[in-house]
């Protein structure tokens, strides 16, 4: 859950900075100088929308480490850290991925994966999770996070965020222009956007931004089911993932920082529409009803 919320908040911050900069530089005044230029507005919205999303993606790993105070294991200091690194290495090898950075952070049970690409990823687990689960369950959680990396979920989320950013910026400014024209009336000569445009476009941007987050969280929940299935495949058995989820259901799952809420193993919001994760019961049911992952059959040799 951590990854998505961090990504969303970073994205909002970047979009806000880019939007304010554009306003200061007079981009809005240019777009409305001779009536609203819809084509140029759409191009501007796409540039800011996708630009903000990709900047957030590039910052994701650094922000994740900072917000959780995660410590990257460069040299294992004990047997548990050595096991953790070795398990991630084995799972990554099965998934055909480069070895990600492995980190530990203090807190209640949770885990996350993040990074701008499969070759620059990070897998982190909390001390609370390591203390509350047996190694097979922890391995399943690690497999879930490795599956996120294998599925390219951060890049997918970035593209989705870029699309919704574009629509938010485009619609908020287009409606702001209409509101401004309505408030001015037909008799007032237009000399660029007025106060009605500035206030209404910002208000629309906030409202549409909240609605857009529902779309992003919907796709995030879908990716969680895929990561659970991917974990079962990497483990060669769905039971460890089911057991891990049941263990989480009996614990007080750690609340990752709001800006990181989308890539943790557990979590969700107070309202289902704004939750980055499906209910644990739904995830367990999906795993139980899925076809068991195939395991290699030993070849028979003739005597």
UniProtKB/Swiss-Prot annotation:
What Enzyme Commission number(s) does the record list for this chain? 3.4.24.-
> In Gene Ontology terms, what is one molecular function of this protein?
zinc ion binding
The entry's active site is 145
Cofactor binding annotation: Binds 1 zinc ion per subunit.
Q: Which UniProt keywords apply?
A: Cell inner membrane, Cell membrane, Hydrolase, Membrane, Metal-binding, Metalloprotease, Protease, Transmembrane, Transmembrane helix, Zinc
User: What membrane topology does the annotation report for this chain?
Assistant: Multi-pass membrane protein
Binding residues for Zn(2+)? 144, 148, 224
Q: Which residues cross the membrane?
A: 4-24, 38-58, 152-172, 199-219
**What domain of life does the native source organism fall in?**
Bacteria
Which cofactors does this gene product need?
Zn(2+)
Q: Where is the signal peptide?
A: none
GO process terms (BP): proteolysis
Q: Where in the cell is it found?
A: Cell inner membrane
The record, for Gene3D superfamilies, names: Metalloproteases ('zincins'), catalytic domain
Cellular-component GO terms for this entry: plasma membrane
> Which family is it part of?
Belongs to the peptidase M48B family.
Name this polypeptide is given: Protease HtpX homolog
Give the classification, highest ranks: Bacteria, Pseudomonadati, Chlorobiota, Chlorobiia, Chlorobiales
Gene name, please?
Answer: htpX
